[in-house]
């Protein structure tokens, strides 16, 4: 250590400071100042010196065995941060190398004696907008896992493809006249180029698209198997029909009565549609969830969607105008037969098949108007708990089978024809929705379940729970369930209903059969013929697959409900080959879900013309080990894939009951924080916390550089009395907050983007994008580069070779390395990618304090870095003298002997007198020991405000701090 006087200061690495503040520049009041043009923290580590009045100390820093002359200060200030390592040259170079040498190709005939790892992204829809920075989040995570497993000796399957059929391409074709095939291929080319620019280790030899006939041949083949098993059928069902788009929409594609795409009106109307009987697999889909290593939240969403419940079907006789029973009954499904005596009205869905039979003439017009009103809502909107309940009295009554009471029949849209029987018995005392409806329309309320835990004051509050039954007996029917528990009463009601013919026990599901047809062109043709004479449906022969789409130039809706394919007359009109009878091809196409239901299987054997997948290959690669995608697919996509997989399991195509062993949903990357202020009519700012009627003022967006944080709030820098509102939104073109990854790669490099997205926070959590935050990880990569390669020359370029030595590593170096190996490995395995990066940062910080960089330390670290920052790692590996890619090098393993925390108690003297002790690791450096001493409560009072003359350190023995009482005092706090 230098003998000249030092100013006592507790230093934090500037990179660590930037890391801690990475989510917003306003979270800390710390300011790093430097006389240089670049912030002090942006300078190469070796250029950081004690500056006094802007004059740099003349001392030089030793690194390895070499003394390096510092470049001039003028040259230093002219080198921009993004030039401190040559990512512009490195990244394209290694991307070409990987592609030219097919480094990540998985052979068709792999060595099956080795373990396998199949990691898969939910493949993207190739939209015209291309990727935004939210897409690479999941792709980077799967790439890190794939690279780790390759280096651990696994056969890795890591493919990419395109979910390319769908409504957006068809709408674009209608608007522009461009064929959807042309648009799709163009979009795929752009997506592929963007993905390659990010260095993902996909096996591009296995690339596929759902729009390729060689692929959808097998989608059609699966449909035929479903048809043969009676799982594909036609039915008249109420659907979301969009006249403007000319197609049926899923509930998820309808928002506030209009189509999500285009905002076109949507109505409910019955149509004959192809359906898939997913309900036949409801129990298996539910039971097998317990065997899956999925997040409990995803499994619970699937359980709720399937919605298995046990209850009873009960029959209510319809009464005529004189109050007499008719021969017509309304059957309801209820999970609470114990509350039967509390049913004071009934509700039927607007689509109920008996509604036209019992509605009275006086109420008919109101009912018809209400049916039209309800037809403009999706099922999701109709069943939203928070919505205002609406309905119309039908004018008719039904008989409560338990007590003989005549109860009114209402029609309301919160009851769905597709669930249960399309009718409910309403018990307003014990159901929140029924209670809201009853209060609104002055319908009687009868309490029949007592909650013994409630006070008497709560006795007349709605109570949906279980309890003791009361007010539930009658001589007319002989049914008496008073004083029974809810469970006992339910069993007794079911037994009574079955004995008297008033109902039966029933298991019900919320899950509905899958509506499988779309009235559009750009989708897989359904391989079915309809005979002209009888209307009978006939499956086409498997030998005729694929049934390809005909070329069409007009994709506009027909206006009649007929799909666009009906315009291809010569394609539609055909004959049944087996009988010679005239027939027509089915003109509806499959939904976009179809191609994505099974693509994971085709990736195992993508070029096979004879089978969907080779049995041996499927047996080896199944199931997918890790499947990563957005939470928006946690229900339907996964449920549909599981359904098809179970059908394929039943017919012997696949060997596993489930397709995906582990599913992970990544969080959403939100747009950058937007700061909103308000101005009054005079143009003066109005503070957000002092004005209640902000909506009357003009909103303005304030740039981040004009904002500061004050306490828990954000305020105008020029006027801190003006409070602002920070908001974050999902990235969207309409908000103008989409960040293009191409721009980030150009500015900072692909490795920086990869590293930043993994470092933003826990992988499964939502995060806010902050472009300034990427500078921190870029600095880390630059420091890593300089640690191995050295300083740039005066022109900003770097010499060939490295600073690595062949010295034997010290015990401290080995411990630091193996601690890093253990942390990085564990964190990748646990998908805690951000803390794995923190471990590498700690290593680099420690390595800068060493006098040398031994090969036995640096090479393993480069391998650790490679899954995260593969371009830089490949370049460093090459410069370290290795001729081949590191992609298949063995990933380092931590030696437990170096992970033991061996600590010692170190005496600390001040001016030769022992003042206390500190606990340090064996091999602790002088600087680290001094920092610990200065942070110790007992020792701080001797050091605070003092100037250090020198330090005497005997490792493992003693630290003696000699104070200079004549020098200027500087606080340690």
From Swiss-Prot:
<feature type="short sequence motif" description="'HIGH' region">
    <location>
        <begin position="126"/>
        <end position="135"/>
    </location>
</feature>
<keyword id="KW-0030">Aminoacyl-tRNA synthetase</keyword>
<dbReference type="GO" id="GO:0006429">
    <property type="term" value="P:leucyl-tRNA aminoacylation"/>
</dbReference>
<feature type="binding site">
    <location>
        <position position="733"/>
    </location>
    <ligand>
        <name>ATP</name>
    </ligand>
</feature>
<keyword id="KW-0436">Ligase</keyword>
<protein>
    <recommendedName>
        <fullName>Leucine--tRNA ligase, chloroplastic/mitochondrial</fullName>
        <ecNumber>6.1.1.4</ecNumber>
    </recommendedName>
</protein>
<dbReference type="InterPro" id="IPR015413">
    <property type="entry name" value="Methionyl/Leucyl_tRNA_Synth"/>
</dbReference>
<keyword id="KW-0648">Protein biosynthesis</keyword>
<dbReference type="GO" id="GO:0002161">
    <property type="term" value="F:aminoacyl-tRNA deacylase activity"/>
</dbReference>
<dbReference type="Pfam" id="PF00133">
    <property type="entry name" value="tRNA-synt_1"/>
</dbReference>
<dbReference type="InterPro" id="IPR025709">
    <property type="entry name" value="Leu_tRNA-synth_edit"/>
</dbReference>
<dbReference type="GO" id="GO:0009507">
    <property type="term" value="C:chloroplast"/>
</dbReference>
<dbReference type="Pfam" id="PF08264">
    <property type="entry name" value="Anticodon_1"/>
</dbReference>
<dbReference type="GO" id="GO:0005739">
    <property type="term" value="C:mitochondrion"/>
</dbReference>
<dbReference type="InterPro" id="IPR014729">
    <property type="entry name" value="Rossmann-like_a/b/a_fold"/>
</dbReference>
<feature type="short sequence motif" description="'KMSKS' region">
    <location>
        <begin position="730"/>
        <end position="734"/>
    </location>
</feature>
<dbReference type="InterPro" id="IPR002300">
    <property type="entry name" value="aa-tRNA-synth_Ia"/>
</dbReference>
<dbReference type="InterPro" id="IPR009080">
    <property type="entry name" value="tRNAsynth_Ia_anticodon-bd"/>
</dbReference>
<dbReference type="InterPro" id="IPR002302">
    <property type="entry name" value="Leu-tRNA-ligase"/>
</dbReference>
<keyword id="KW-0547">Nucleotide-binding</keyword>
<dbReference type="Pfam" id="PF09334">
    <property type="entry name" value="tRNA-synt_1g"/>
</dbReference>
<keyword id="KW-0809">Transit peptide</keyword>
<keyword id="KW-0067">ATP-binding</keyword>
<dbReference type="GO" id="GO:0009793">
    <property type="term" value="P:embryo development ending in seed dormancy"/>
</dbReference>
<keyword id="KW-0496">Mitochondrion</keyword>
<dbReference type="GO" id="GO:0009570">
    <property type="term" value="C:chloroplast stroma"/>
</dbReference>
<dbReference type="GO" id="GO:0004823">
    <property type="term" value="F:leucine-tRNA ligase activity"/>
</dbReference>
<keyword id="KW-0934">Plastid</keyword>
<dbReference type="InterPro" id="IPR001412">
    <property type="entry name" value="aa-tRNA-synth_I_CS"/>
</dbReference>
<dbReference type="InterPro" id="IPR013155">
    <property type="entry name" value="M/V/L/I-tRNA-synth_anticd-bd"/>
</dbReference>
<comment type="similarity">
    <text>Belongs to the class-I aminoacyl-tRNA synthetase family.</text>
</comment>
<dbReference type="GO" id="GO:0005524">
    <property type="term" value="F:ATP binding"/>
</dbReference>
<comment type="function">
    <text>Catalyzes the specific attachment of an amino acid to its cognate tRNA in a two step reaction: the amino acid (AA) is first activated by ATP to form AA-AMP and then transferred to the acceptor end of the tRNA.</text>
</comment>
<dbReference type="InterPro" id="IPR009008">
    <property type="entry name" value="Val/Leu/Ile-tRNA-synth_edit"/>
</dbReference>
<keyword id="KW-0150">Chloroplast</keyword>
<dbReference type="Pfam" id="PF13603">
    <property type="entry name" value="tRNA-synt_1_2"/>
</dbReference>
